[in-house]
């Protein structure tokens, strides 16, 4: 069973409201989540010696999350990942979004779901956040009611996303936590062993928009079906890092997505999801300029993300899994982050 405590985390400037922190604790995990962006700010996991370390990148204070920073721990929406040129059509009508990562719209726009205050509700073993995204927010059509629920069950953090729309709109929600299983202040993730359950991936153009091809991983750097040691793998294939969607083999039911093992500490993260894809990102844009928790700096490759999602730019790619949510339907996806030692 998990316990839940709440406290004030900080005040938004100009009377913007109070940001609260919710601490979820089980015998195996401790997770801190704030109501600003439904953001995971800390996640403590024990190693094989029973010593707990915080394994997510982030900040000790609210100010860190209000500055320009790479979505540490936040919920992303209305549409995670990139939409080509920030435009799409729904039922013949063209919509234009804010361009916040030239020449595309990224992670919901200038003020996405990560940059708003959510309304919390404490549950017996977790916390539920809700908000109404108004019609036209960041250029998206229709009003969207959204619920994000975090629950703790032993060594498992479960994240459920639900949404209902007043008119047809693309919806693709994820969490953008950066993990380092050696501890959040460790300089890199080179010694992490990574497995991703995907036979295919999406090649991208120079602006990181999928080309439309669904390519086999066989014989490429993207074949992560058997464990690879990340640093050596990137070196062997002369890669700058990963920032790609892997197409998962599962159905709409819960299926295995990825496993990451840090041999030195024994920590293991397994990810399961109902989503058809996962963006594996190795912190390629981190540059060491942000000051994180306990004075940590976050250089390139100091954290990895496993962003469970629909495939990027699906609203413009008819052969990708459907991303439109229509009135009367419910968006309902769950991701499980399961921690253990081995």
Swiss-Prot record:
Catalyzed chemical reaction(s): alpha-D-galactose = beta-D-galactose; alpha-D-glucose = beta-D-glucose
Modified residues (Phosphoserine): 14, 124
Compartments where found: Cytoplasm
PROSITE patterns per UniProt: ALDOSE_1_EPIMERASE
Any matching Pfam family: Aldose_epim
Keywords: Acetylation, Carbohydrate metabolism, Cytoplasm, Disease variant, Isomerase, Phosphoprotein
Enzyme class: isomerase
Impact reported for residue 267 to G: In GALAC4; decreased protein stability
Active site location: 176 (proton donor), 307 (proton acceptor)
GO biological process assignments: carbohydrate metabolic process; galactose catabolic process via UDP-galactose, Leloir pathway; galactose metabolic process; glucose metabolic process
Enzyme Commission identifier(s): 5.1.3.3
Pathway: Carbohydrate metabolism; hexose metabolism; Carbohydrate metabolism; galactose metabolism
GO molecular function, one term: aldose 1-epimerase activity
Amino-acid positions noted as binding beta-D-galactose in the UniProt annotation, renumbered to this chain: 81-82, 107, 176-178, 243, 279, 307
Keyword Ligase among record annotations: no
Keyword Acetylation set for record: yes
InterPro entries linked to this entry: Ald1_epimerase_CS, Aldose_1-epimerase, Aldose_1/G6P_1-epimerase, Gal_mutarotase_sf_dom, Galactose_mutarotase-like, GH-type_carb-bd
Modified residues (N-acetylalanine): 2
Main localization, broad class: cytoplasm
Disease: Galactosemia 4: A form of galactosemia, an inborn error of galactose metabolism typically manifesting in the neonatal period, after ingestion of galactose, with jaundice, hepatosplenomegaly, hepatocellular insufficiency, food intolerance, hypoglycemia, renal tubular dysfunction, muscle hypotonia, sepsis and cataract. GALAC4 inheritance is autosomal recessive.
NCBIfam families the record matches: PRK11055.1
Summary of subunit composition and partner proteins: Monomer.
Family: Belongs to the aldose epimerase family.
General function of this protein: Mutarotase that catalyzes the interconversion of beta-D-galactose and alpha-D-galactose during galactose metabolism. Beta-D-galactose is metabolized in the liver into glucose 1-phosphate, the primary metabolic fuel, by the action of four enzymes that constitute the Leloir pathway: GALM, GALK1 (galactokinase), GALT (galactose-1-phosphate uridylyltransferase) and GALE (UDP-galactose-4'-epimerase). Involved in the maintenance of the equilibrium between the beta- and alpha-anomers of galactose, therefore ensuring a sufficient supply of the alpha-anomer for GALK1.
Name of the featured protein: Galactose mutarotase
Natural source organism: Homo sapiens
Lineage start: Eukaryota, Metazoa, Chordata, Craniata, Vertebrata
Encoding gene (name): GALM
């Amino acid at each position: 069973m998990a316990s839940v405590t709440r406290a004030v985390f900080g005040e938004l400037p100009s009377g913007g409201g109070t940001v609260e922190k919710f601490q979820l604790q089980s015998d195996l995990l401790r997770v801190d989540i704030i109501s600003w962006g439904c953001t995971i700010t800390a996640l403590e996991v024990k190693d094989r010696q029973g010593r707990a370390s915080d394994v997510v990148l982030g900040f000790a204070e609210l100010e860190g999350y209000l500055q320009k920073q790479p979505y540490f721990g936040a919920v992303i929406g209305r549409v995670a990942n990139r939409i080509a040129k920030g435009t799409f059509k729904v039922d013949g009508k063209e919509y234009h979004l804010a361009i916040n990562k030239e020449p595309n719209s990224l992670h919901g726009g200038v003020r996405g779901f990560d940059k708003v205050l959510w309304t919390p509700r404490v549950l017996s073993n977790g916390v539920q956040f809700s908000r109404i995204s108004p019609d036209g927010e960041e250029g998206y059509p229709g009003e969207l009611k959204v619920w994000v629920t975090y629950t703790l069950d032993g060594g498992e953090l479960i994240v459920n996303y639900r949404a209902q729309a007043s008119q047809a709109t693309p919806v693709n929600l994820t969490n953008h936590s950066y993990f380092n299983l050696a501890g959040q202040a460790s300089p890199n993730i080179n010694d992490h062993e990574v497995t991703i359950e995907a036979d295919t991936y999406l090649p991208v153009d120079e602006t990181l928009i999928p080309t439309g091809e669904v390519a086999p991983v066989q014989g490429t750097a993207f074949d992560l079906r058997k464990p690879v040691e990340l640093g050596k793998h990137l070196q062997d294939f002369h890669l700058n890092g990963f920032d790609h969607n892997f197409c998962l083999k599962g159905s709409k039911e819960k299926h295995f997505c990825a496993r990451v093992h840090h041999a030195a500490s024994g920590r293991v993260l397994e990810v399961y999801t109902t989503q058809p894809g996962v963006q594996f990102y190795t912190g390629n844009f981190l540059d060491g300029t942000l000051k994180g928790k306990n004075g940590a700096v976050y250089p390139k490759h100091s954290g990895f993300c496993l962003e469970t999602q629909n495939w990027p730019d699906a609203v413009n790619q008819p052969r990708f899994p459907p991303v439109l949510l229509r009135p009367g339907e419910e968006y309902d996806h769950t991701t499980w982050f399961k921690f253990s030692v081995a």
